[in-house]
Amino acid sequence: MEVFESLKTNLVGKNARIVLPEGEEPRILQAAKRIVKETDVTPVLLGNPDKIRIYLEIEGVLEGYEVIDPHSYAVFDEMVASLVERRKGKMTEEEARQILQDDVNYFGVMLVHLGIVDGMVSGAIHSTAATVRPALQIIKTRPNVKRTSGAFLMVRGSERYLFGDCAININPDAEGLAEIAINSAITAKMFGIDPKIAMLSYSTKGSGFGESVDKVVEATKIAHE
């Protein structure tokens, strides 16, 4: 089964709710339209309710989605208190209130943290750093995971590849590379891919030399262990 069809099948009956912080962006609105029409997932869009509803009504989408205005949300004070607690002395109540009003990614991540939604998709108009930072500060990593890494899922016909890390870690050491490889394999399994790991470098069968090649060789050994 094609990877995205498999994902949609797995979500049937789960009542999943996914927040889309960039809710007024046309590409996000088109994505929300497809989500409503093609899946059982409920998109939760952040932004101006009137703008979003008018756009989706013109597109023929009258129900199956939710809109949250961060400036008038019923449990906003609860979100502020929870964010202050989560940051443990690194953010005042006033700072938390301001960032939740101004930054839709922080608002979206707090919805995930509080269990109001099941996940978040962002990054259409925000940088990787602006998208990932709130998640690192609030949700954090799984236990025993030392570093966060990114991964891209590439589909070429019936072939599926997952590349990591091409977004977050600039120059990881050998131990970091090994952990990224292992976590990428775990991510691949989530998409129904039986992972076979390839460690990439500019050396082909030992033809190249240097510190970066040595690091990849060492990372491969660590990953095997």
Descriptions of predicted regions:
Residues 1-225:
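Anion-binding alpha/beta catalytic cores of soluble intermediary-metabolism enzymes, centered on
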